[in-house]
Amino acid sequence: MARNSLPTITAGEAGLNRYLDEIRKFPMLEPQEEYMLGKRYAEHGDRDAAHKLVTSHLRLVAKIAMGYRGYGLPIGEVVSEGNVGLMQAVKKFDPERGFRLATYAMWWIKASIQEYILRSWSLVKMGTTANQKRLFFNLRRLKGRIQAIDDGDLKPEHVKEIATKLQVSEEEVISMNRRLHGDASLNAPIKASEGESGQWQDWLVDDHESQEAVLIEQDELETRRRMLAKAMGVLNDRERRIFEARRLAEDPVTLEELSSEFDISRERVRQIEVRAFEKVQEAVQKEALEAARALRVVDA
């Protein structure tokens, strides 16, 4: 997309460290500068402008890519796929819409990386059932949320909690955890430039991006809400009421209360809840898959 080449990652930890050092040299853009560069590329196809937009966001790609280290794939390839998503985002970026490129690009980056993971992981590793796929993409996040130490097998109470949250069996949780175990910790030591040492999480911290990170997080939350609201359109009135009462309320309504409200058994309420969740999840996944496929569409 640009005449200027991007830094490349060579194999091994040393190669990754060199890459991180290189991309830190690219300056971050002020909002007005980003706007003008976006205009130059959108209106005139200015490749130098596009190159500056891409290089100024390579750190964002690296940050996102680090979150996918637990899938057993070469981090260099994960970063490269994220860079493909970033370049697609730059091609589609419209500065007149009023939001920053980072906010827009993060979705393209994540979609590109996730599509690469889906292509790369064998069905033997990932599994073919809906439960296995649900675990594949949610287990690591839930382990972090409940502060489960990732040093081997999960504690029984953690297995039970994850199984309940994802509506899967405890045996499936244990099996998938063993398949995915071995991801690198953000506390793992790395050797930085000029003889300095530190941890992965130290590199990820950048005070200059703190305000932008907050804005990105807010935008991500709002986007998730919009996606959920759209996905819930597939539910009928009863399914929607039960789904909201059981899954979205701060204090979930009991099966007993809902069974009285609809004059049906508690087991029937539970079945409707599970089915509604599956329908919403399927709708969200369909939208995400369509977004991922769009990444492969190259403008003529």
Swiss-Prot record:
Domain of life of the organism encoding this protein: Bacteria
Transmembrane segments: none
GO biological-process terms attached to the record: DNA-templated transcription initiation; response to heat
Family under the similarity heading: Belongs to the sigma-70 factor family. RpoH subfamily.
Pfam families membership: Sigma70_r1_2 (PF00140), Sigma70_r2 (PF04542), Sigma70_r4 (PF04545)
A molecular-function term among this protein's GO annotations: sigma factor activity
Its biological purpose: Sigma factors are initiation factors that promote the attachment of RNA polymerase to specific initiation sites and are then released. This sigma factor is involved in regulation of expression of heat shock genes.
Annotated Gene Ontology cellular component terms: cytoplasm
Renumbered residue ranges of the record's region Sigma-70 factor domain-4: 231-282
Assembly with partners or alone: Interacts with the RNA polymerase core enzyme.
DNA-binding stretch(es), residue numbering of this chain: 255-274
SUPFAM superfamilies the UniProt entry points to: Sigma2 domain of RNA polymerase sigma factors, Sigma3 and sigma4 domains of RNA polymerase sigma factors
Protein name as catalogued: RNA polymerase sigma factor RpoH
Annotated stretches, region: Sigma-70 factor domain-2: 53-122
Matches recorded under InterPro entries: RNA_pol_sigma-70_dom, RNA_pol_sigma70, RNA_pol_sigma70_r1_2, RNA_pol_sigma70_r2, RNA_pol_sigma70_r4, RNA_pol_sigma_r2, RNA_pol_sigma_r3/r4-like, RNA_pol_sigma_RpoH_proteobac
Compartment(s) where it occurs, according to its Swiss-Prot or TrEMBL record: Cytoplasm
Keywords recorded for this protein, A-Z: Cytoplasm, DNA-binding, Sigma factor, Stress response, Transcription, Transcription regulation
Position of sequence motif Interaction with polymerase core subunit RpoC: 77-80
